[in-house]
Swiss-Prot record:
This is Small ribosomal subunit protein bS18c. Residues 1-20 are annotated as: Disordered. One of its GO terms (biological process) is translation. It is found in: Plastid, Chloroplast. GO terms for cellular component: chloroplast; mitochondrial small ribosomal subunit.
Length: 101
């Protein structure tokens, strides 16, 4: 078949490349809390390399920095602050718990 007469040709769309999360000037260090906190989930877990969109070497450095910051108590190991919302506080009723004799 002739190349000029292809029935299904897809047009090449241009796409914007995402900016890398770590710039070349950023230093991956346990003291750089603004950088480290971007790679931790709300539960306090280290996000995966696929989610972070970083290279393998950068992910290893981030992981080591996070673990060092946790050991030095700059970061919590778990971020499990459960927030319960109550619309109205109701007092406990003790009259329902009467013993029958």
């Amino acid at each position: 078949m002739n190349k000029s007469k292809r029935p299904f040709t897809k047009s090449k769309r241009s796409f914007r490349r995402r900016l890398p999360p770590i710039q070349s000037g950023d230093r991956i260090d346990y003291r750089n809390m603004s950088l480290i906190s971007r790679f931790i989930s709300e539960q306090g877990k280290i996000l995966s390399r696929r989610v972070n969109r970083v290279t393998l070497k950068q992910q290893r450095l981030i992981t080591m920095a996070i673990k060092q910051a946790r050991i030095l108590s700059l970061l919590p190991f778990l971020n499990n602050q459960k927030q319960f919302e109550r619309s109205e506080s109701t007092p406990r009723t003790t009259s329902l718990r009467t013993r029958k004799k």
